[in-house]
A protein has these predicted regions:
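Glycine-rich phosphate-binding loops that contact phosphosugars or nucleotide phosphates
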Residues: 129-137, 144-288
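Single, functionally critical "micro-switch" positions that shape active/binding sites
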Residues: 32-34, 153, 291
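Single conserved hydrophobic/aromatic residue that forms the stacking wall/gate
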Residues: 286-296
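Expand to "…catalyze enediolate/carbanion chemistry for C-C bond making/breaking, isomerization
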Residues: 2-4
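Extended, charge-enriched "interface" segments that sit outside catalytic cores
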Residues: 6-14, 18-143
Length: 296
């Protein structure tokens, strides 16, 4: 039997009726904000974050109705299924375990018969070692200069999450290692990046699960040619974040470093995987810190 569509549930119809009421002029946000207790009633704190929805056109009844709908759709049970490794992407037969990248409790997370945590910890530790070697100068550019710039090359979820986090935490960034993002195939984006960097001190981080994404490879090829034109070996200043066995994870054409992505982590949720951990650990130094608050 197929599952009832959400818009056929009585809880949905209750919300529709409530929405009509909330669209009345007396429920305008400017009137709702006159309530001095509104901020306390419409906010949450946790994990070092403050969530404020007091500026949304909702009241306590709205939230109660939304919670009723969530209960009818078994949101908590489905979330528990997701974080425990259940198949929640039936079209591809995959788990969705971005949450596992935020775990530091040592507990296993099973996908079928496999505990995925050892592989996640292995990548996490490898990224930590790599970023440490960049920061202490053990790893340098092909001419022996310390890295001063990191350019993330990607598109969609392969760059957007890391860029958001980098901007939000830029006051804590390492001022000696500037982070740049190259996502647009418009030549102006590439031109702006190369104007801001020194090729001898630039580390290129190319992020693509398949390593066949047309836009990402177009920019990666531009970057490689930019380096070659200046007498530099692009592979010695290249890091790839990609699926194991992809063209970007080729032992016959090795980059300075390569970190694997997992098929159970989708692009838009990948910031706490190597996708975000590599650039953010280089810019923000402490690899575990960006992921720890998100556990809650």
């Amino acid at each position: 039997m197929s599952e009832t569509q959400v818009n056929a549930l009585p809880q949905w119809k209750d919300l529709q009726e409530h929405a009509a009421e909330m669209n009345q002029s007396q429920r305008h946000l400017k009137h709702l904000l006159q309530d001095r207790e509104r901020l306390a009633a419409c906010s949450l704190r946790g994990g070092g974050l403050f969530y404020d929805h007091s500026r949304q056109r909702v009241v306590s009844e709205t939230m109660a109705l939304l919670y009723d709908l969530a209960e009818a759709r078994q949101v908590k049970a489905r979330f528990a299924q997701m974080v425990s490794g259940g198949i929640v992407n039936p079209s591809e037969g995959r788990a969705a375990l971005h949450t596992a990248c935020r775990r530091f409790d040592g507990q296993p997370v099973w996908v079928g018969q496999q505990d995925v945590m050892p592989a996640i910890r292995s990548i996490r530790d490898a990224v930590k070692r790599f970023s440490g070697q960049v920061h202490d100068g053990t790893l340098r550019g092909s001419t022996g200069k310390r890295f001063a710039h990191v350019v993330v090359v990607g598109i969609g979820g392969s760059y957007l999450g890391p860029e958001f986090v980098a901007r939000a935490l830029q006051s804590s960034a390492d001022k000696g290692l500037r982070l740049h993002f190259l996502s647009n195939v418009d030549i102006d984006n590439f031109g702006a990046v190369i104007e801001a960097v020194d090729p001898e001190t630039t580390l290129w981080v190319v992020v693509s699960k398949s390593y066949t994404t047309v836009e990402t490879l177009a920019n990666a090829n531009l970057a490689a040619q930019f380096m070659r034109d200046r007498g530099l070996d692009p592979l010695k200043q290249l890091v790839t974040v990609t699926a194991k066995g992809s063209p970007g994870d080729d032992p016959n054409n090795p980059a300075l470093a390569s970190f694997n992505m997992f098929d159970f982590i989708g692009g838009r949720y990948s910031v706490s995987s190597a996708v975000g951990a590599v650039p953010l650990s280089l810019s923000l130094i402490h690899i575990s810190e960006p992921t720890r608050p998100r556990r809650q």
